[in-house]
Design a protein with these regions (language model features):
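Beta-sandwich interaction modules
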Residues: 39, 175-189
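Noncatalytic modules at the cell exterior or secretory-pathway interfaces
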Residues: 43-51, 189-202
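Conserved small/polar residues in nucleotide/adenosyl-binding loops
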Residues: 218-224
Length: 228
């Protein structure tokens, strides 16, 4: 079968439980992103989206597309070029694949360890890791979260991996490590253009990126969406 960007290999409640039918949130309302699922929310330019990590060990794969065109999206390759580094800091502006500003990191209460190198997990990744059955994954969560609010994915871009800890060594090698974020950490992102943000509570359980040992997957929360 020819590759279809919007096709999901399996499904979970992401497909059936959008935050609203049209994707717009009620201002100031708290929304949950259940463990192993994703949600999409439409933002107006100037809106501030705050994401909270209740237990501290949950990675959030964050994507954003312009409302003008789903073919213009947050581009990690372009962000690395624009920033001149492979890490992000509070105050950084993240750009699209067309190099236009889309999101600004306006506050980060965590130690600031996030990733802009690693692709989102998908079913082929879990096949490589030895999984034979369906496994929840961030690529499908992205597709389903968009479908749930009436948008068809035209690409599956690399995400901004919030709280993912991928240290890079002097020789260029990197490793998969547990998050250094702590319970209750938040990150606040300001929309610099009308866009749709998609967040996946990463279900990766075969590498340490969501913690080590008996990992307790948790939800993420979106406590605040407000206009400035």
């Amino acid at each position: 079968m020819a590759y279809q960007p919007a096709h999901h290999d399996g499904e979970n409640e992401t497909l059936h439980a959008p935050i609203s039918a049209d994707g717009y949130a009620e201002k100031g309302q708290e929304y949950l992103i259940p463990a192993r699922q994703g949600r999409a929310v439409k933002l107006h330019q100037g809106d501030i989206l705050q994401i909270t990590n209740p237990q501290g060990n949950q990675v959030c794969d964050f994507f954003a597309l312009t409302l003008e065109s789903s073919a213009e999206f947050l581009g990690m390759e372009q962000c690395r070029t624009s920033l001149g580094r492979v890490y992000v800091n509070q105050g950084d502006v993240l750009v699209t694949n067309r190099r236009r500003p889309l999101v600004e990191i306006i506050e980060d209460t965590s130690p600031g360890v996030h990733d802009i190198l690693i692709a989102c997990c998908d079913l082929p990744r879990y096949r490589d890791l030895g999984v034979s059955d369906y496994h929840d994954n961030c690529a499908d969560n992205f597709r389903m979260a968009l479908t749930a609010i009436g948008i068809e994915a035209t690409h599956v871009p690399s995400p901004f991996n919030i709280w993912m800890n991928i240290p890079v060594k002097e020789d260029g090698a990197y490793s998969w490590e547990a998050p250094v974020s702590k319970a209750g950490d938040t990150i606040s992102l300001k929309a610099l253009a009308d866009c749709v943000a998609v967040m996946s509570a990463c279900p990766q359980d075969l590498t340490p990126v969501n913690g080590v040992g008996a990992v307790s997957y948790t939800h993420l929360t979106l406590p605040t969406i407000c206009s400035v």
